[in-house]
Amino acid sequence: MTNFRLNLLAYSVMLGLTAGVAYAAQPTNQPTNQPTNQPTNQDGNVSEQLEQINVLGSDNHNDNTPPKIAETIKTAKKPEKEQAQDVKDLVRYETGITVVEAGRFGNSGFAVRGVDENRVAVQIDGLHQAETISSQGFKELFEGYGNFNNTRNTAEIETLKQVTIRKGADSLKSGSGALGGSVSFDTKDARDYLLNKNYYASYKRGYNTADNQNLQTLTLAGRYKYFDAIAVITSRKGHELENYGYKNYNDRIQGREREKADPYRRTQESKLLKFAFQPTENHRLSVVVDLYKQTSKGHDFSYTLKQNTEHMTYDEVELRHTNDKVDRKNLAFTYENFTETPFWDTLKISYSHQKITTTARTDDYCDGNDKCALAGNPLGMKYNQDNQLVGEDGNLAKYKDINTKQTIHEKLPFTKPNEKWRYNRVDWDALKKKYPGVPIYASCIEENNDPSKYCSYDVEIPKKENTFEINGKQYDLLSEADKNVISDEQRLPTNSSYLFSCDGLNCDKDTIQGFEKKGTTVNIPFVVIEKNGKKYAKTEAVANNQLSGPYIFMPSKTGYQTNLWTQRDLTSETKQINLDLTKHLELGKTQHDLSYGGLWSEMEKSMTNISGDSPMNVKWWAQYPHSCDIFLPSSTPNGAPTLNPERTNTLCNNSNVYSFLIPVKTKTGALYFINDFRVNSHIAFNFGYRYDRVKYDPEYIPGKTPKIPDDMVVNLYVKQPTFDDTKVNLPPEELRKKEANAAANIKAIVQPKKFSASSYSVGTTLDPLNWLRLQAKYGKAFRAPTSDEIYFTFLHPDFSIRPNRDLQAETAKTKELALTLHNEIGYVTTSVFDTRYRNFIDLAYKGLYNVQRHSKLTPYHTYQNVNRPNAKVTGWEIAAQISLGKITQFLNGLNLSYKYTYQKGRIDGNIPMNAIQPKTSVYGVSYAHPADKFGLDLYFTHVSAKNAEDTYNMFYKEEGKKDSTIKWRSKSYTTIDLLGYIKPIKNLTLRAGVYNLTNRKYITWDSARSIRPFGTSNMINQKTGEGINRFYAPGRNYRMSVQFEF
């Protein structure tokens, strides 16, 4: 019934439009382009002016301009009206484009026309944003374990003036990466607000129940003489996105079967500052500072290597703490010239310096302090001023561990009186049964000729006494009840030297009390040493072995909790110069709008991994290492150094800096030319061409660049120098040879690589009638292989990856045709498209390669990135909008809209493309008061089920499955959103919205396909489906905001 009603709405839109076309009295003028810095209505209010600056590209219900083929432009008013808080909300009511889900790290770019992430270009003010490490081998090795924040960053919605979404191959504006499409963000400018006055101020507060997000945005703009400036400062603070049924799930469950969303505290801080100097109408200088920082701190309770804590308390269990960040900084300088010359009407030169760092930090430690294992001191042990062991009551402790025996005199009657020897006359078996386990020797105390009628025998029963007395209580350490009071780890044998902090001992003395097994106490000598400004007592080794000699007692062995941590940073730093020119020409009866220019950029991409272990909650009894050096000097004059067994002690605060990627500097040069020209009022063409040249220069400097682990590359290509790796701990000389071998192999890998590509787009627009438009487009785009796809190397017997310096650039060609019916009432556009991808980069199994290991050749299962032949995506779309107020005055302000996308795709002819979204329809009903005092928007979104035959599990063979489809998919669903706003006074706007009005339980396909078949993160129980509720979208939720404008 729901589908029938929704389809009826779509038919009503088209029927109304057709009727409007038939009875239209006036033709529709063709739209004209307007510069974004020129106002279209000097009499509008400030909030309207921001929208009116971008009339051509606006996406407002009141704008019935037919859309350009495969392009959507959303100005600032649209996301503001929809109360969008992130890029997912930005495309919430769009079809054919979705946001890629990345688990705890949030979103990672867009999915368009069967491809996603790096194959959909993302730009902010013309600058490419950070790409993911797209090597499939890297993703399979590391991404499934939650160790890398391998995501694409995004923009703060409140800073955006305009968003341009292009579908299909089009590298003219975006260069490398726009295979499936592109998303371009343009930030706000002071000129957008300062039309009729010299100042503007706005303050907005908002709240979202889905993730408990609080929003604050302050916007200030002003002009003084030749200067103008704008500042947009935004702060967002919230928590994890609450999945459907969030409050009903058990919060104590950990692991893959956890149904409740993992807890995170998320913040997002953004500052956009622009300062401009415009001494004349034709010259303008600007400085831009764009700062963006996103943080997420919490716990990976769904991490599969953690135990289930349903019946335990969190503070006593080691937990995985996460601290993820995205930090983007951009400093830009711009010069604009508006003087009309034979070569340009506008000229813009800009220089940008952008640095983006994505960080993933994990810390594994216990939160409970003294409640944690081996951390407490339940007996209150301490050493007094005489360094004697006492309890909480201050009385001396006592210890005894002795072996004694009990003698029982037995008189055994003769059972065999006729035997010659006395001991043979006794039944010894009966005595053994009486004293099981006690050695019995057949021997009588009496002589053989003794006249007595019995045999005397002393039974010696061994007896062990092991007691510990403290706080006035004696513990029998041999009993079940007390045996764990003092563990072996608390008894420190004195055949070794120990290093204790003087915080717990009186270092004015020179001994510490020890206990002999027989119960007597002895003084263990120590000397005081100083390290890093702190004093320690170094005890003397007084025993010959571990079993003999006295013991020193401590509350526990370690005296601290261990924090195992890793921090992995992916950094992209870009320096870019752009030259952009526009020119309008009239040649005969044709009009040409030219845009041309070029860019040069230099981008450095690198990875830095730091991992280690550090102590937490350090107690006075902690045993410090004598030395943290890797090697210890030889004990003999000419001997070789030896590895220090204490070098990995947690109290050394160990850390190791390394990388899995070779740093690469990418240099890009590009030239482009675009001509939009109109022959007459019925025929228009556009043509564009772009040439890109990309060069990769690996920059690996031994000793300076974060080290590539030797075992990843040794003996890969170069076999010299040879070394003996059969030894567990290599001596220094062999270690140097191994490092030299690794350096030689890295040098063989890091060879420069160049790519060049030509991109183009050809299109036409035909308007044979004033209500009919035909559009056609043919475009080509490319994506150069990322540096990690070329150079990434990994060596392991089960999964090795070899670099591939022969990779070719991926290409895409799109053909698209659109038919539009339009007039002042609205429009209906139907388009069909066909995109062909070539040279898709994918991971392929290359067989067994023999690698020199442990002085012999060992077969390694080897993979390599290769170019796949082709992939194809086809589909069709509908976009419709009608203003009912144009039909009858009674319905003035009421608008209907409809969008629909269907697409299907395959790789190599038969492998489904998982990035393709199911069939999606969005129906909209909108009302806006003629004076803009209030308005309502109602959206119906229907998404079909993801069919099994349209999914592909690339690991089905490894999982032992015959079916290559993905088991857990999204079902069909329909959601309803109701949004509204009211302006009670001129300067105040109140907004509110109800999302998922019917409280429908559903999972999106992008969320379902983020579930991984293996790893430790984003996992569920694949057999039962337990844990999948964690991936469901929120139930009914609300948003509200209040905004003051002056």
UniProtKB/Swiss-Prot annotation:
Short sequence motif named TonB box, residue ranges: 51-58
Region annotation 4 X 4 AA tandem repeats of Q-P-T-N: where it falls in the sequence: 26-41
Keywords: Cell outer membrane, Membrane, Receptor, Repeat, Signal, TonB box, Transmembrane, Transmembrane beta strand, Transport
Organism superkingdom: Bacteria
Motif TonB C-terminal box boundaries: 1029-1046
Signal peptide interval: 1-24
InterPro entries reported for this sequence: Plug_dom (IPR012910), Plug_dom_sf (IPR037066), PT (IPR006970), TonB-dep_rcpt-like (IPR039426), TonB-dep_rcpt_b-brl (IPR000531), TonB_Hb/transfer/lactofer_rcpt (IPR010949), TonB_rcpt_b-brl_sf (IPR036942), TonB_rcpt_CS (IPR010917)
Positions annotated as Sequence repeat: 26-29, 30-33, 34-37, 38-41
The keyword Aminoacyl-tRNA synthetase is annotated on this UniProt entry: no
Membrane topology, record value: Multi-pass membrane protein
Compartments where found: Cell outer membrane
Main location class: membrane
GO CC annotation terms, alphabetical: cell outer membrane
Residue ranges constituting the TBDR plug domain according to the UniProt record: 61-188
Gene Ontology molecular function terms on file: siderophore uptake transmembrane transporter activity
Domain TBDR beta-barrel: 196-1046
Any one Pfam family match given in the protein's UniProt record, by short name: TonB_dep_Rec_b-barrel
Its job: Acts as a receptor for the hemoglobin/haptoglobin complex of the human host and is required for heme uptake. Does not bind hemoglobin alone.
Family of the protein in this entry: Belongs to the TonB-dependent receptor family. Hemoglobin/haptoglobin binding protein subfamily.
Additional detail: This protein is subject to phase-variable expression associated with alteration in the length of the CCAA repeat region. This mechanism is called slipped-strand mispairing. Addition or loss of CCAA repeat units would change the reading frame and result in introduction of stop codons downstream of the repeat region. This may be a mechanism of regulation and a way to avoid the immunological response of the host.
Name assigned to this protein: Hemoglobin-haptoglobin-binding protein A
Species lineage: Bacteria, Pseudomonadati, Pseudomonadota, Gammaproteobacteria, Pasteurellales
Gene that produces this protein: hhuA
